[in-house]
């Protein structure tokens, strides 16, 4: 079983690469010339040089049974950069795969709950709900989905919409761990989120690639629980054995924080696009379809996962 992973050097992609190897796949990783290979160094993988934004560099994508497309940007300096990375890049990789992979068994696109948007009524979002992304990131991930769906009948595919993903190597949730450790965390009222530990996600991704029932389908993936912002703070606090002060911040101040963060560092985890998402209080999804159709069975809940994540951060001097 020959598999190609794009985005293999990133947080989720590196975990997926390790899991594919453990499951007996022969893995190739599409990497750019300037990619940081620290998470896949020493793994028994082949490196294929290419860039999803450059169609000419993708001509060597040939003879794969499975393609897992994770490459993209969660935080971009501007809208055009996000479009090129998430939407145009997906179109390019889809076209490249179609040309030279006649025995392809599955193309798996890792999208995001951001493509569906927040829950409009407080109920967990299902896969058949009308998509209403509120951020540039969400809109470009939805654009990527549309390119994949446009290949129906020409290419077997599955689209995965993960909820908030966390675990070792995650740089996004790290900022909240650091805030808790510092002893002060901004709090703009109770919000609700779906989460999923990274090991459970990659197991679900591989499961979806192998199941015939997943062909042509979209699946939300979460651990099945709904966590309030208080639950999240409490889980991280317990993991770090800290008790931070919650600094009340009105939601009206969120855009101002985003502007300041954007000027301090482009692509920051707290940039204006990400804060646009945080203005909404229900980022929850139902994983019922994945559970019933695929037998998806996540094992790790937030309290346990936060402990494992904090241990990894400490061991690697991230905290």
Describe each model-derived feature in a short phrase.
Residues 3-23:
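N-terminal Rossmann NAD(P)H-binding glycine-rich loop of SDR-like oxidoreductase domains
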Residues 45-88, 92, 98, 116:
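NAD(P)H-binding glycine-rich loop region in Rossmannoid oxidoreductase-like domains
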Residues 83-90, 97, 108-111, 140-141, ...:
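Short alpha-helix in the Rossmann-fold core of NAD(P)-dependent oxidoreductases
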Residues 92-136:
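Conserved Rossmann-fold NAD(P)-dependent oxidoreductase catalytic core, especially the SDR/UDP-sugar
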Residues 132-158:
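Active-site Tyr-X1-5-Lys
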Residues 143, 171-175, 188-210, 216-220:
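Substrate-positioning beta->alpha
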Residues 158-175:
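Flexible, glycine-rich beta-alpha linker
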Residues 211-270, 293, 303, 307-310, ...:
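Mid/C-terminal beta-alpha module of Rossmann-like enzyme folds, strongest
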């Amino acid at each position: 079983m020959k598999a190609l992973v794009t985005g293999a050097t990133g947080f989720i992609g590196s975990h997926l690469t390790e899991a594919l190897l453990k499951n007996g796949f022969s893995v190739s990783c599409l990497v750019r010339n300037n990619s940081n290979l620290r998470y896949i160094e020493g793994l028994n993988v082949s490196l294929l040089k290419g860039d999803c934004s450059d169609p000419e560099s993708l001509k060597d994508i040939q003879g794969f049974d499975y393609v897992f497309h994770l490459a993209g940007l969660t935080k971009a300096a501007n809208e055009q950069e996000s479009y090129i990375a998430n939407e145009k890049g997906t179109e390019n990789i889809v076209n490249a795969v179609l040309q030279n992979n006649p025995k392809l068994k599955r193309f798996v696109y890792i999208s995001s709950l951001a493509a569906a948007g927040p829950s409009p009524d407080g109920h967990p979002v299902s896969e058949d709900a009308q998509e209403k992304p509120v951020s540039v990131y969400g809109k470009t991930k939805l654009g990527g989905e549309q390119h994949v769906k446009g290949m129906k009948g020409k290419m077997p595919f599955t689209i995965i919409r993960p909820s908030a993903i966390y675990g070792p190597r995650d740089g996004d949730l790290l900022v909240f761990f650091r805030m808790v450790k510092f002893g002060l965390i901004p709090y703009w009222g109770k919000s609700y989120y779906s989460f999923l530990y990274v090991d459970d996600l990659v197991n679900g991704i591989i499961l979806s690639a192998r199941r015939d029932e997943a062909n042509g389908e979209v699946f939300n993936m979460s651990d099945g629980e709904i966590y309030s912002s208080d639950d999240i703070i409490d889980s991280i606090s317990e993991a770090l054995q800290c008790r931070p002060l919650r600094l009340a911040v009105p939601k009206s101040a969120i855009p101002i924080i985003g502007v300041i963060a954007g000027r301090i560092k482009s692509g920051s985890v707290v940039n204006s696009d990400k804060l646009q998402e945080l203005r909404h209080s229900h980022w929850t999804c139902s994983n019922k379809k994945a559970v019933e159709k695929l037998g998806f069975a996540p094992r790790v809940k937030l309290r346990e996962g936060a402990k494992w994540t904090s241990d990894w951060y400490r061991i690697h001097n991230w905290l």
